[in-house]
Swiss-Prot record:
Entry function: Catalyzes the transfer of the phosphoribosyl group of 5-phosphorylribose-1-pyrophosphate (PRPP) to anthranilate to yield N-(5'-phosphoribosyl)-anthranilate (PRA).
UniProt lineage: Bacteria, Pseudomonadati, Pseudomonadota, Alphaproteobacteria, Caulobacterales
Organism: Phenylobacterium zucineum (strain HLK1)
Family annotation (Pfam families): Glycos_trans_3N, Glycos_transf_3
Alphabetized UniProt keyword annotations: Amino-acid biosynthesis, Aromatic amino acid biosynthesis, Glycosyltransferase, Magnesium, Metal-binding, Transferase, Tryptophan biosynthesis
Recorded name of the encoding gene: trpD
Catalytic activity: N-(5-phospho-beta-D-ribosyl)anthranilate + diphosphate = 5-phospho-alpha-D-ribose 1-diphosphate + anthranilate
Residues annotated as binding Mg(2+) 2: D226, E227
Protein name, as recorded: Anthranilate phosphoribosyltransferase
Length: 337
């Protein structure tokens, strides 16, 4: 069976790009464990050295979506997540944003994993907060409905990745799969705020989300962070109405102070969980500001507000009124084993 992939690998080695059909077929085969580890590693390496194309990214995402264990909520959802890999070890921003967005009335299907290159991934800090990250689908749906947020643990929903995960770990460098977490939400979130680890991926991932059927999405990179940032300027690609629009955002433009990276640097999962608890309890400062900015983007993408500044103000009210904290508490209650 593995001999069937040799012609494709030869083309990749010569620098060719894969057609949509070839890419879809190859990645689907990878998720079934058909190519040998050496063949998967060779393909990933060739694509990384040449530069992954938009078609290859979309095809790989489609293959992952088909192989996923899906959650099917009866209402529209939004996801707020990043690719990770920025290497800056910040506090958990998108995790906190999920609770603020839920407290503001959105239904947040938060897709995430344990830390890969950071010290504290979404799953790590949620575990410290008392959330059962292994909650069954019926509990996830209940949490979405009643708490406004659920957590979709990537390994549980993308079990087919077990065929490629050891290969990725052995390679030790970024591959196309590092871009795919935000493109493969198991609940089929049609609206998203996606952070990417490098600015060059802002526009391509927005285009990919459009190809994959998103209604509206922001793909962002902020001064080295896979988030909107208060430490500098954020580059944004908005997909909406079938088009991609590029623009930049500064914190001052929405009434926020510029911060230093040191002000939002995190630590262990336990330390980041404590910081998140203090934030939800009303603590002000740089962490609150960057969370409010990212939550504002979620509110805007979900058409909850008309401007980013209005979104920042709504995020502040949600935090001050304890609604984000209530979302966390209800999520913990519902997912308890």
């Amino acid at each position: 069976m593995s001999d069937a992939f040799k012609p494709l690998l030869s083309r990749l080695a010569d620098g060719a790009t894969l057609s949509d059909d070839d890419a879809d077929a190859f990645f689907s085969a990878c998720l079934r464990g058909e190519p040998t580890p050496a063949q998967v590693g060779a393909a990933l390496t060739a694509m990384r050295m040449r530069g992954e194309t938009l078609g290859e990214i979309a095809a790989c995402a489609r293959a992952m979506r088909r192989a996923a264990i899906h959650l099917e909520p009866p209402f529209p959802t939004i996801d707020v997540c990043g690719t990770g890999g920025d290497g800056l070890h910040t506090l958990n921003i998108s995790t906190a944003v999920g609770f603020v967005a839920a407290g503001g009335g959105l239904k947040v299907a938060k897709h995430g994993n344990r830390a890969m290159s950071s010290k504290s991934g979404t799953a790590d800090v949620l575990g410290e907060l008392g959330v059962n990250i292994a909650a069954p689908p019926e509990k996830q749906l209940q949490a979405l409905d009643e708490a406004g947020i659920c957590f979709l643990f990537a390994p549980a929903h993308h079990s087919a990745m077990r065929h490629v995960s050891p290969i990725r770990a052995e390679l030790g460098f970024r591959t196309i799969f590092n871009l795919l977490g935000p493109l493969t939400n198991p609940a089929g979130a049609q609206r998203q705020v996606v952070g990417v680890f490098a600015e060059r991926w802002v526009k391509p991932l927005a285009q990919a989300l459009g190809m994959l059927g998103s209604e509206k999405a922001w793909v962002v990179h902020g001064a080295g962070l896979d988030e909107l940032t208060t430490t500098g300027e954020t580059s944004v690609a908005e997909f909406s109405d079938g088009k991609v629009r590029l623009f930049t955002i500064t914190p001052e433009a929405v009434g926020l102070r510029r911060a230093a990276l040191a002000d939002i640097t995190g630590g262990s999962p336990a330390e980041n969980a404590q910081a998140l608890r203090r934030l939800l309890a009303g603590e002000t400062g740089a962490y609150r500001d960057i969370v409010a900015l990212n939550a504002a983007a979620a509110f805007l993408v979900a058409d909850k507000v008309e401007t980013l500044r209005e979104g920042v103000e709504l995020a502040g009210r949600v935090l001050d009124e304890g609604r984000a904290q209530a979302a966390l508490e209800r999520l913990v209650e519902i997912t308890a084993p």
